[in-house]
Swiss-Prot record:
Part of the 50S ribosomal subunit. This is Large ribosomal subunit protein uL24. One of its GO terms (biological process) is translation. GO terms for cellular component: ribonucleoprotein complex; ribosome. The gene is rplX. GO terms for molecular function: rRNA binding; structural constituent of ribosome. The keyword rRNA-binding applies. It comes from Shewanella pealeana (strain ATCC 700345 / ANG-SQ1).
Length: 104
């Protein structure tokens, strides 16, 4: 099945502590989760590693968020939207269901 949300898509969070926030998808995991820039930030206690030059301390990083808790953001309407697929010139393309525009 083709992915409705892909890397570099702008998404909006529908549920959870970051509800209403927008961000770009930086990674799509095979478990049905996404890593979105600036969303679902957690603090991680990192051990120092002198060989890699990594200083120890508390680091803030993005944790995966369930794909069902986000929706793709349609910049034309300014709202969350659903994605459909259709064939144009023999290629499968994604489009927004609300206004039938192609997803970048």
């Amino acid at each position: 099945m083709a992915a409705k949300i892909r890397r570099q898509d702008e998404v909006i969070v529908l549920a959870g502590k970051d509800q209403g926030k927008r961000g770009k998808v930086s990674q799509v995991l095979p478990t049905g989760k996404l890593i979105v820039e600036g969303i679902n930030l957690v603090k991680k206690h990192q051990k120092p590693n002198p060989q890699l030059g990594v200083a120890g301390g508390i680091v803030e990083q993005e944790a995966p968020i369930q794909a069902s808790n986000v929706a793709i953001f349609n910049s034309a309407t300014g709202k969350a939207d659903r994605v459909g697929f259709r064939f144009e010139d023999g290629k499968k393309v994604r489009f927004f269901k609300s206004n039938s525009e192609l997803v970048k």
